[in-house]
């Protein structure tokens, strides 16, 4: 039996991706990232100073926070106030690690960039959309620092994007939506640069095991998606 995608896409086809830049007024960088029906507001704020372990090193820092808004899913999500769920902590650390890899932190100087990823609507892929859209907001934020003369040049080293790949009925599919995400035997999240150098691979075999040849197929499919996402980032930043 072959899995039929609910939205009619081909196995190697991304959902429509859009980046709406300068979506809010006050943040140094702000992007509404849309991946199909998943919508994430990504903002980047600049704060003076760095964590204590980086003080007097001349090096900057980037950290991330991730939340799902109450109306982002069919059933209302409770706000995480006093204590974050393990899932939320895992995702915001992933976003932070991924976007730090895009930066020359020494060139940033002793300041902190805070990436906020707020999920307005969730149809799977919220963490990958947060990373891919967060990068666009990050570029806008550091360009603002350059234009204000606060740093001499952009500390961006390379593009970073992320995508999911799932195994359904034994076949790999790119960029899962929610029905596919819950039905996948294997779910993989891949973060990479425009040179297709891997920054992170998160994978779980929900049912049974994952043979190495199938993992290679999934990574090959992820590379196709990463290239397309980075091209979409370039087009958005050039507009």
Curated annotation (Swiss-Prot):
Q: Which domain of life is it from?
A: Bacteria
Q: Which UniProt keywords apply?
A: Nucleotidyltransferase, RNA-binding, rRNA processing, Transferase, tRNA processing, tRNA-binding
Q: Which residues bind phosphate?
A: 87, 125-127
Q: Which InterPro entries does the record associate with it?
A: ExoRNase_PH_dom1, ExoRNase_PH_dom2, ExoRNase_PH_dom2_sf, PNPase/RNase_PH_dom_sf, Ribosomal_Su5_D2-typ_SF, RNase_PH, RNase_PH_bac-type, RNase_PH_CS
Any one GO biological process: rRNA processing
Q: Name the catalysed reactions.
A: tRNA(n+1) + phosphate = tRNA(n) + a ribonucleoside 5'-diphosphate
Question: What terms describe the molecular function in GO for this protein?
Answer: 3'-5'-RNA exonuclease activity; tRNA binding; tRNA nucleotidyltransferase activity
Q: What is its EC number?
A: 2.7.7.56
The top EC class, named as a word, is transferase
Q: Name one Pfam family in it.
A: RNase_PH
- HAMAP family xref list: RNase_PH
Stated role: Phosphorolytic 3'-5' exoribonuclease that plays an important role in tRNA 3'-end maturation. Removes nucleotide residues following the 3'-CCA terminus of tRNAs; can also add nucleotides to the ends of RNA molecules by using nucleoside diphosphates as substrates, but this may not be physiologically important. Probably plays a role in initiation of 16S rRNA degradation (leading to ribosome degradation) during starvation.
> Could you give the subunit structure recorded for this chain?
Homohexameric ring arranged as a trimer of dimers.
**Similarity comment:** Belongs to the RNase PH family.
**Protein name, per record:** Ribonuclease PH
């Amino acid at each position: 039996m072959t899995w039929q995608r609910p939205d009619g896409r081909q196995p190697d086809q991304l959902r429509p991706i859009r980046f709406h830049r300068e979506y809010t007024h006050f943040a140094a960088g702000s992007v509404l990232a849309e991946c199909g029906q998943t919508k994430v507001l990504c903002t980047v704020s600049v704060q003076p100073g760095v964590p204590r372990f980086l003080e007097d090193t001349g090096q900057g820092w980037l950290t991330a926070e991730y939340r799902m808004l109450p109306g982002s899913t069919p059933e209302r999500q409770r706000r995480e106030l006093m204590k974050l769920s393990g899932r939320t902590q895992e995702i915001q650390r992933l976003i932070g690690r991924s976007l730090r890899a895009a930066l020359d932190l020494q060139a940033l100087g002793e300041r902190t960039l805070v990436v906020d990823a707020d999920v307005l609507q969730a149809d799977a892929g919220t963490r990958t959309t947060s990373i891919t859209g967060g990068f666009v907001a990050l570029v806008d934020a550091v360009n603002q620092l350059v234009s204000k003369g606060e740093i001499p040049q952009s500390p961006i080293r390379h593009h970073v994007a992320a995508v999911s790949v799932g195994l359904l009925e034994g076949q790999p599919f790119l960029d899962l939506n929610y029905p596919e995400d819950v039905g996948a035997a294997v779910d993989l999240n891949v973060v990479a640069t425009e040179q297709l150098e891997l920054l992170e691979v998160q994978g779980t075999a929900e049912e049974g095991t994952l043979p190495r040849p199938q993992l290679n197929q999934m990574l090959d499919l992820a590379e196709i998606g990463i290239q397309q996402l980075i091209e979409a980032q370039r087009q958005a930043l050039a507009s």
